[in-house]
Amino acid sequence: MIRSSIVILSLLLISHLVSAKVLLIGNSTSLSFDDVEATFTPMIKRSDQGGVLYVAEPLDACSDLVNTVNVKNGTTVSPPYVLIIRGGCSFEDKIRNAQKAGYKAAIVYDYEDFGFLVSMAGNPSGVLIYGTFVSKATGEVLKEYAGRTDFEVWLMPSFETSAWSIMAISFISLLAMSAVLATCFFVRRHRVRRRRILALNGNDFHRMPKSMIIRMPTTIFNGICDEATTSILCCICLENYEKGDKLRILPCHHKFHVACVDLWLGQRKSFCPVCKRDARSISTDKPPSEHTPFLSRTPSMTPTSSFLLSSSSTTPLQSSHELPISIRVDPSLPSTSMQPHTVPMYLSHSRSHTSFQNGSNRFSRPIPVSRSSADLRNAVSQRSYNSPHQVSLPRFLHSRYTHILGPGNASRSQVVGLLTSQREHSLHQNDSRRSFIHFASASSLPGW
């Protein structure tokens, strides 16, 4: 719709720009006719003089004209205009023959009344006279006054046309600017909308530049596999690593062939093919393995009481505020003294235990006590504790309670009571007493 409107306005603009007026002025007579200027002749810019009109011989002016400039009483009637009929040859031939005969302007009229005027076209090279096209009716009227020296023909430029042309040009310019602005607006809106959709879908991963990829660390595979999931084969090409292969390490600590991962990051997406982590991020975290804790040290975690089931050798504590706890099963006790779903437990120090620390945020899950005593008795190696010295106590407990109990005189109930009171004090400081409800008193340890 917009394109068709622009084309129509352009045609109207062209037709108005080349249009002019033919005036026939004589004794008390003035006639005006519409005409269209030729496109290959000089444009009529002013009307400072007129000329006498003559009829061409031959009328179609397809050959050299017989009648040239008329000479009367030794004076030259100047400038003469010639009237030519359409047809027989091209407009360019008619205009050139009229120019050769010495005429200043050529007026071509139509041989049929089509109702509209046409614009004459041709090669403008060497054409110096004016040329206009009029209708059949205008040509017949002008033919009646041809050869009369008391009547002159004037070719007038249309000043009204200039105003129309200015308005048309302004309107077309405004329309074009509006179309360009609307196109830019809709294109920008589409791009913003597409970016939002990609961001919501989580697909806002772009390709990484080669400079960032080269800065990532690399390593040489020596045949030793670590705990990482990508330490055996490349998850991109699915080929096992061979000794001497060059591997690239991503920020998530996953490893791949250098050629494979460089092609992936440079031409596909900027995330890890395994864990989908953005490779553009920087991380100093160690890769997860069997030696790293299950729970990371984050401020969002709440303190939780924890103790681990372990059978490793005991080592001294690092701080006087730590109270390690481990759970052991005494297989030497008779099975008749055990209640269903209860397990007799001892307290000993283990190197792999997590200590209770004031203000610490790193804890493990509590171990449930409701387990079968038979299963635990079969899983744990048999050990017997015949004296209170075999109860693995921390150094600060030995130094604190030796002068009270005395070596060799402490009973199990006394040791458990002292340890229970100390444990309750530590649990109160760590705000996790609820998790140790089964160990709040010595009565919860059967068989002691």
Curated annotation (Swiss-Prot):
One of its GO terms (biological process) is protein transport. It comes from the Eukaryota. Residues 1-20 form the signal peptide. Pfam families: PA, zf-RING_2. Residues 298-315 have a biased composition (Low complexity). Keywords: Disulfide bond, Glycoprotein, Membrane, Metal-binding, Protein transport, Signal, Transmembrane, Transmembrane helix, Transport, Vacuole, Zinc, Zinc-finger. Glycans are attached at N27, N73. Residues 21-165 are lumenal. Residues 281-315 are annotated as: Disordered. GO terms for cellular component: endomembrane system; protein storage vacuole membrane. GO terms for molecular function: zinc ion binding. Residues 74-146 form the PA domain. The chain crosses the membrane at residues 166-186. It is found in: Prevacuolar compartment membrane; Protein storage vacuole membrane. Disulfide bonds join C62-C89. A zinc finger (RING-type) spans 234-276. Residues 187-448 are cytoplasmic. SUPFAM superfamilies: PA domain (SSF52025), RING/U-box (SSF57850). CDD domains: PA_C_RZF_like. It is a single-pass type I membrane protein. Involved in the trafficking of vacuolar proteins. May function as a sorting receptor for protein trafficking to the protein storage vacuole (PSV). This is Receptor homology region, transmembrane domain- and RING domain-containing protein 4. The gene is RMR4.
